[in-house]
């Protein structure tokens, strides 16, 4: 299963136990969706219960409601919260969704086939995979890219027809032509030209065009990988990825990169993270490790929503990166269990 000589995993090894059982693998992923939506729904309702309209939202240690406010839910002029009922509805919807996902996970764990190739549904058989079948792995990658592409496209549609909070004018507004500045996204933001650092994007038109561009790229990549198996040269170049350890290492690398990008973006950007909801931009400090601090005076032990989001993303990204390195080395054939033996032999020689 893995490129190391340790094909068996204990109960604590998570999805690795199901690397050869596509049905169980699917069940584990659906269960993760259930946990994520349960957390999102529960924390949204928890934050709503402790929300104080007399205190700035950014100074209350909230992390989910500020995102909903940025999307224009229940927000009036100047970033004032005029209706909290949408937050309640969204929290409940996520809890209901978590129950649906949980039921799906239980079905696939207890009733569904362990191997999707044995499913009674032809569509489900399309998602059975073998680690030496590059076409099947490419097909699954393609569907993941489609999901991300549709999400980016959905945000563009939301910008066009509902609108989000624009911190530059203090109002919720729509973007009437969300692809108008796509050339700027490609040739200015894409090359970090002066006044076009993507981390400091300062208008909704560019934000919309960036998401429209990413949506097109992701959807094109999704359709490509669904219909085109990886080329032989790609399989040779990325041979270590066609294994459970390799796939996990690549996923963790992407997650880590996204975490570092999100940490810095949330620390400095005031368009996607308005000051009204997240607090003012942060200041970078250095100690044993880099960290970001608030630039306003708060009661002892209190932090802005921006500080929580930024620092949690940064340190999670750091530890996820260590996981990437661990699994990447295992995918390349390195056996960590030999390290104590090697150290023991050195001490014996001494």
Curated annotation (Swiss-Prot):
Partners and quaternary state? The antenna complex consists of chlorophylls (a and b) and chlorophyll a/b binding proteins.
One Gene Ontology BP term is: photosynthetic electron transport chain
Xref: NCBIfam families? PS_antenn_a_b
Annotated gene: pcbA
Please identify the protein, giving its name as recorded.
Chlorophyll a/b light-harvesting protein PcbA
Q: Which family does it belong to?
A: Belongs to the PsbB/PsbC family. IsiA/Pcb subfamily.
The record's function comment reads: The antenna complex functions as a light receptor, it captures and delivers excitation energy to photosystems II and I. The Prochlorales pcb genes are not related to higher plant LHCs.
Q: Does the keyword Transmembrane helix apply?
A: yes
**Location within or outside the cell:** Cellular thylakoid membrane
Protein's membrane topology: Multi-pass membrane protein
A single Gene Ontology CC annotation of this entry is: photosystem II
Q: Which GO terms describe its molecular function?
A: chlorophyll binding
- UniProt xrefs under InterPro entries: PS_antenna-like, PS_II_antenna-like_sf
Q: Which organism is it from?
A: Prochlorothrix hollandica
Q: Which cofactor does it need?
A: chlorophyll a; chlorophyll b
> Which UniProt keywords are given for this protein, alphabetically ordered?
Chlorophyll, Chromophore, Membrane, Photosynthesis, Photosystem I, Photosystem II, Thylakoid, Transmembrane, Transmembrane helix
Q: How is the cofactor bound?
A: Chlorophyll a.
Instruction: List residues traversing the bilayer.
Output: 26-46, 62-82, 87-107, 214-234, 248-268, 309-329
